[in-house]
């Protein structure tokens, strides 16, 4: 009986250790507020990805789970971008280019009327584009690469997306 208990303890310890090691390798997106992201982007010389969502939006939840939860996407965001989230239906302000906006006003200023939407900004805070709707992880990774590697400066999205 003692041998069985020892075997069970060794197996349990091995499973626990393996689980902790796997969990340590998972990259999670470290989300900022929009205002924090604009400040940090200037200091770190990184572009910004702003996820605009609402609590009731099913596609927003799916984007969180499948796209932002994808290890490659999360790693790319962590390495190349300052990632921010904003819910325009919640209280809060966004400081952007010397002006203060409510979160709803900022979403409206970006032309966002549906959720989810993803806004991309350059290192100085200039808006690059807004992508409406849910985006699959592989497609989102293409967009992340397109902006992170500054391909957008020399190649249109149409040309780039045909190559990949």
What is the meaning of each model-derived region?
Residues 1-7:
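Positively charged n-region of N-terminal signal peptides that target proteins for export
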Residues 10-19:
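Bacterial N-terminal signal peptides
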Residues 19-25:
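Sec/Tat signal peptide C-region and signal peptidase I cleavage site
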Residues 30-48, 77:
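A short beta-strand-turn-helix
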Residues 44-58, 83:
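Short active-site neighborhood of thiol/selenol oxidoreductases, capturing the structured segment around
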Residues 60-78:
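Typically the conserved alpha-helix immediately C-terminal to a functionally engaged Cys/Sec
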Residues 66-68, 108-153:
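Non-catalytic, surface beta->alpha helical segment in thiol-disulfide oxidoreductase systems
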Residues 86-113:
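Structural alpha/beta surface segment adjacent to cysteine/selenocysteine redox centers
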